[in-house]
From Swiss-Prot:
GO terms for biological process: FtsZ-dependent cytokinesis. It comes from Rhizobium meliloti (strain 1021). This is Cell division protein FtsA. It is found in: Cell inner membrane. Keywords: Cell cycle, Cell division, Cell inner membrane, Cell membrane, Membrane. Self-interacts. Interacts with FtsZ. Belongs to the FtsA/MreB family. The gene is ftsA. Coiled coil: none annotated. The lineage of its organism: Bacteria, Pseudomonadati, Pseudomonadota, Alphaproteobacteria, Hyphomicrobiales. Cell division protein that is involved in the assembly of the Z ring. May serve as a membrane anchor for the Z ring. GO terms for cellular component: cell division site; cytoplasmic side of plasma membrane.
Length: 442
């Protein structure tokens, strides 16, 4: 059955994880440069003291990854090609895990991700805040976000207010005259999500849930204090670069730009008249986001385009490669800087930026990012999982690992049911347990 019913504004939320037994989760990261399938076992443990909902440890028991085909800038461009790659990646993960899967959690980079904050208030008349009051104010905020052309990926209450006093995390049982809520809603265009689901269905698999790429990569790459105090995670992929801003343990903003590492590769291929695969090798081996005086003296050979082995390679200074790389990297970083500034969340981000994704491994990128973004920058690798092979411990696998973390925090969200009313799924926090009661009682 499709996730997209005719009356559904939001995607169905994942079922709560079992609290007393282990559970197997399978995920699929469909990117412009690679497709990754991971299978993991989630085992209950003591809940994190800082990050809400982190109740399970994760062990990767199967992984498969393939070079991507049929995806351009995060958008499905060739259904047959994507289906073939998905089959190969899933098969490799199943063989390693020794089991067969039938559903997956999938990432979303396409669909023009849009992040909005909606505010709503209701009158309490000086009475105590009850569970039904929370339901009403969440529904009032949620109704503002409903659009027929877009599907809700994530909807998180980022904070409540009482009588204008903001920053209240859990107002249940408190007294006041006016109860308010700020709701962060992340949406994507429905056709892009339908095409993504279609690719997975054609591989005889179903989509269990969809997670925005910036949310997933942030879950994997940020440490507790960064998520609590405020930080931005920049996931530099092959075809897209995504931005996620976290504060007080929650995702408060997300964005995406259609530039990534593959654009650097194509710039090199055009500028040096060489094949894409040779340009990729030149980028990895010789490319740098920083100028170096020695680059003018170092000469490198560039294989020409063509099938004639007798064609002689051209020789260029390494500085030319770096100049081409640097121009595109600086353009991307400047665009990220402007997006963060325009979002209004720049003060929340403060001085903390974490770079992750495959393109973040380019030589000199952290230094270039510090200069252009004017913030402290570190490279973020996937955290919080065991069993990852050495080849999958780098920034390129942050999104896939974040997809495995997501089921633990999915119950922090509210979502639009078929009727358009917002409901809350259960979990282990006080607010989530209240949500489970709401779900069962109304």
């Amino acid at each position: 059955m499709s996730l997209f019913g005719s009356a559904n504004f939001g995607l169905p939320r994942l079922k709560p994880l079992p609290s007393k037994r282990s559970h197997v989760v399978s995920v699929l990261d469909i990117g412009s440069t690679k497709v990754v399938c991971m299978i993991g076992r989630l085992t209950p443990r003591a809940e994190s003291q800082i990050l809400p909902g982190r109740t399970h440890s994760i062990e990767v028991i199967g992984i498969g990854h393939q070079k991507s085909r049929g995806v351009k800038n995060g958008v499905i461009a060739d259904l047959d090609a994507v289906e073939s790659v998905v089959r190969l990646a899933v098969d490799a993960a199943e063989r390693m895990a020794g089991l067969t899967i039938d559903s997956l959690i999938v990432n979303v980079s396409a669909g023009r991700l849009q992040s909005d904050v909606y505010t709503a208030t209701i009158d309490l008349g000086g009475q105590e805040v009850e569970a039904n009051d929370l339901k009403k104010v969440l529904a009032a905020a949620g109704h503002q976000s409903l659009r027929t052309d877009r599907a809700i990926l994530h909807s998180l209450p980022t904070g409540f207010s009482l009588d204008g006093e903001r920053g209240i995390r859990d107002p249940l049982a408190m007294f006041g005259d006016v109860l308010g809520v700020d709701m962060h809603v992340l949406t994507a265009e429905r056709p892009a999500l339908k095409n993504l689901e279609l690719c997975v269905n054609r591989a005889h698999l179903s989509v269990e849930g969809m997670v925005a790429t910036p949310y997933a990569s942030g879950l994997a790459a940020l440490v507790d204090d960064e998520v609590e105090l405020g930080c931005a995670a920049i996931d530099m992929g092959g075809g897209t670069t995504t931005i996620s801003v976290f504060a007080e343990g929650k995702l408060v903003h997300a964005d995406a730009v259609g530039l990534g590492g593959h654009h650097v590769t194509t710039d090199l291929a055009r500028g040096l008249s060489t094949r894409i695969e040779d340009a990729e090798r030149l980028k990895v081996v010789h490319g740098s986001a920083l100028p170096n005086s020695a680059d003018e003296r170092d000469i490198i050979s560039v294989p020409p385009i063509g099938e004639d082995d007798r064609d002689q390679p051209t020789h260029v200074p390494r500085a030319l490669v770096s100049r081409i790389v640097r121009a595109r990297i600086e353009e991307t970083l400047e665009l990220i800087r402007d997006r963060i500034q325009r979002s209004g969340f720049s003060p929340i981000v403060g001085k903390r930026i974490v770079l992750t994704g495959g393109a973040s491994q380019l030589t000199g990128l952290p230094e270039a990012a510090r200069r252009i973004l004017a913030r402290n920058v570190r490279i973020g690798r996937p955290l919080g999982v065991s069993g990852l092979p050495a080849a999958a411990k780098g920034p390129a696998f942050s999104t896939a690992v974040g997809l495995m973390i997501y089921p633990q925090v999915a119950d922090l969200e509210t979502h639009a049911a078929g009727s358009g009313m917002f409901s809350t799924l259960g979990g282990n926090s006080r607010f989530a347990r209240m949500g489970q009661w709401l779900k069962e009682s109304f």
